[in-house]
Structures are given as C-alpha cells and as structure tokens.
A protein has these predicted regions:
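Anionic group-transfer/hydrolysis microenvironments
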Residues: 30, 190, 307-309
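Short secondary-structure transition/capping segments
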Residues: 38-40, 76, 317-318
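Extracellular/periplasmic, surface-exposed regions of secreted and cell-surface proteins
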Residues: 10, 45-46, 51-57, 66-71, ...
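Outer-membrane beta-barrel translocator/receptor signature
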Residues: 1, 5-49, 58-61, 150-152
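A short glycine/small-residue-enriched secondary-structure motif
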Residues: 186-194
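N-terminal, post-signal-peptide soluble/periplasmic segments
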Residues: 1, 58-100
Length: 426
C-alpha cells in the first residue's frame, strides 16, 4: 500500500472528417492521462493529425498529404528498485524514522552508519548503509525522472495518370520525421544511493529522418500478353544527435577545496565521486536505391516476375558501398491447361519456382569503416604532475565491410480441390 495504488487512465479523442469539392479531409485531436500502479509514476500525451486527399484533372492527378504531432510528458518511477526494496526491507520498520540522525535521509527511516569519506562535511556525521535494504518509499520520492518528447511527421504523395496514355502513371513521395526528447534525472542528497552528494543529470536526444522516392509504372494488356513494368529510385537519410551531462550537488566540496588554477577555476576534486560528466555525440547514415520490376502474364497460365535492385549505403567505404540484388520467379497454372480445364473438381494446381538475392546492412555502426579515436571515461585518467588527464584510444574498425548477401532458391506446388474444401501448399 505504501508504493502501489489503483491506476486510473483517461483517454479523449475528437475527430472531424468531410470533403470540400475534390478534397476529402480528416482531422483528429487526442489526449491521454494515465497514472501508473507504482506511486509517483504518470504520463500525459497529446496528439493531433491531419489528412488531405485532393484530386484534380478529372482524377488524373491525386495527392495524399498527412501530418502528425505528438507531445508526451512522463514521470518515471524506479519501479523495479522500489519493488525489490519492498521485498528486502524488514516490514516491521517504519517509513519515517524518529530522531535527529534521520535528518541526513530527509526524515525517512534508513539503516545508518558513521560517515568516513576522504572529504568529510562536519555537519553530515552519518550516511546510509549500502549493505542494508533501502526504504522503498524514500526511493520513489527522492528520485525524480522527468521526460518530455515531441514528435512531428509528415508525408506528401502525388500520383499522376498521363492524359491520353492512362496505362502509364508517375508517382512520387516525400516523408520526414523529427523527434526531440529531453530527460532530467534528479537524486536527492538525502537518498540511499547518493547520500550527501546527490545527483542531477540531463539528457537530450534529437533525430530526423527523410525518405523520398519516385517511380513510373506502366501496365497494359496486349491480347494474351499482360505486362506490368515499374522503375524508380529512392533516397533516405537518418540523423541522430545526443547530449548528456551530470554532476553532484555537493556545495560543501566546492567551498572547501583549493583551486588548482586561478584562470580556469578548476577545483581539486580528484577524490570526489560526484565529479561532473559530459558527453555529446552525433551520427547519420543514408541509402540510395534504384529498382525495377517486370511482371509478365501469358494466357493467365504462365507468370514471370523479375526484379533488380541496386543499393548504395554510407555505412561502407568507397568501393564497397553498392550491392546488387536480382530476383526471378516463375509460376505455371497447370489447371488452366486444355488437358485439365474440364476437370470440374480441380480448383487450383500451380507450380512455383523462385530465385533471388537479398542484402543486409543493419546492425553495423555508422562510420565503422573509419579508424576513430575515443576519449576515455572520467575515471580512466593518467596522472601528470598535479593534474589528471583523460586518454584517447583507437576504436575497432573494418574498412573491408560490405553488404551481407543471401541467395535463396525455392520451389513449390499449390493444390486445391472440391470447391477449396481440400487444399495444400508445398
């Protein structure tokens, strides 16, 4: 009862749809509010969307425009830690302690020991015992994790059926997404885990993606010949950028340690476990593709499909960027042959053959083909004189990486009879 509650969730949505002459539209707005079953956790979300589908030139020119927005705000609870602490802590102990010694825990009951740090604040004589179970209620209330997220996305599609040559149509689309997230972590200096030092951290993350493609498609039937041809290109870009920082909330150390350098103002905090940490990173990758497909149907008996795709990835070094992936498939509808067309109980008998190559580039880090040097962590430093300096080390790389290719073959038979009451596929 001290860490759990009955969760309540509300969800509201309003939508409007209609049409203005040749332009159907739909708009919607939604709001969601939820409380978690673990106390202190909750989530608020607002989302909106708009869709327009105008049609012009006697329905030869068609558009589809979509835009979406989402904003979400969360408070996360350390549910796993709180539940584990509740199972470990002596249930006969109170939530709040009695006595001045519990001032160092914000009044919450915790198992205390004498403080014996390398740098000791005389006003802080006790600290929490890391070998004892912590107070789960204190954990929930003294650790605050807040997150904000915004997401914008849009897609624009256009399709044009050529006047006087309606078997040919041109299609193009462009989509984009932008996401921004921010998370703040604050651990009280009265907490079990960061007693006295406390902790405050901030993480920012941004990403945006863009994907565009264009293709032409021609489909026509010439007597017993049915042809469908498609050719096009696609390009995509993915960008990521992140930043985080964290530091201890220990004003006493700042006020009572000598300054090493008057110009920089750096303090002698080499023994301070709450030293500030910062990290920033960014990466991106892109993909360029060209593709084509041919479908040929003769007499509705013999079907041939061939495809070809060429993909160029920024994840590989020059000379290894491109992969080429052909495929072919053949199907024979045997039950459409003259020697079987009078067999009334036979619904389907088809022979299938296929061959193709596919490529894989996922799971490979961006710029993995480039030798990079990485700055060491703050605790992996080298002493030089009175200062400590971070080191750099080369990261692993492979400039021979290229597309992982897989070749597949397949053959099969489809059979159905007695009005499809009996069927199988091999």
């Amino acid at each position: 009862d001290e860490i759990f509650r009955t969760a309540v969730s509300t969800n509201h949505n309003v939508s409007v749809q209609g049409g203005l002459k040749n332009m159907p539209y739909r708009a919607s707005v939604g709001f969601n509010n939820s409380n978690g079953i673990v106390k202190t956790s909750w989530m608020n979300r607002v989302n909106a969307s708009l869709n327009l589908a105008p049609s012009l030139l006697d329905k030869h020119l068609n558009f589809n425009i979509t835009s979406k927005f989402m904003y979400e705000k969360d408070r996360y609870a350390d549910a796993g830690g709180a539940i584990g602490a509740a199972l470990s802590m002596n249930p006969t102990q109170p939530v709040f302690g009695e006595g001045d010694q519990y001032a160092v825990t914000g009044g919450y009951y915790q198992n205390l020991i004498n403080k014996s740090d390398a740098i000791t604040d005389p006003n802080w004589k006790n600290t929490t015992n890391s070998n004892a179970a912590q107070n789960p209620v204190a954990l929930l209330n003294q650790k605050e994790i807040m997150a904000h997220a915004r997401d914008y996305s849009g897609n624009f599609e256009v399709d044009y059926k050529i006047h006087g040559f309606e078997d040919l149509h041109l299609h193009a689309s462009l989509g984009a997404q932008y996401t921004s997230t921010q998370q703040s972590d604050e651990i009280s200096k009265y907490s079990y885990s960061n007693n006295y030092f406390g902790w405050a951290g901030m993480t920012h993350y941004w990403k945006y993606n863009m994907i565009g493609n264009a293709y032409a498609q021609y489909a026509h039937k010439f007597g017993v010949h049915d042809i469908d041809v498609t050719a096009g290109a696609e390009q995509s870009h993915y960008h990521r950028h992140g930043y985080n920082q964290g530091f201890g909330t220990d004003d006493y150390l700042k006020e009572n340690n000598p300054i090493l350098n008057e110009e920089t103002g750096y303090y002698n905090w080499q023994h301070n476990p709450s030293k500030r940490s910062e990290q920033e990173w960014a990466n991106h990758n892109s993909l360029v593709s060209y593709f084509g497909r041919l479908n040929y149907n003769l007499l509705d008996r013999y079907l041939i499909t061939t495809t070809f795709r060429a993909d160029g990835s920024s994840r590989f070094k020059k000379g290894h960027k491109w992969g080429y992936f052909p495929s072919a498939a053949f199907a024979w509808k045997i039950n459409h042959e003259s020697f079987l067309k009078d067999v009334k109980w036979l619904d389907d008998l088809k022979l299938r053959l296929g061959w193709g190559k596919t490529g894989q580039q996922n799971g490979i880090d961006d710029f993995y083909y480039t030798p990079l040097y990485v700055v060491s962590n703050s605790y992996a430093q080298y002493p030089f004189g009175n200062d400590y300096h971070q080191t750099v080390r080369p990261s692993k790389y492979n400039d021979k990486l290229t597309w992982e290719k897989t070749t597949t073959w397949n053959a099969g038979i489809d059979f159905a009879a007695l009005n499809n009451r009996f069927s199988f596929n091999i």
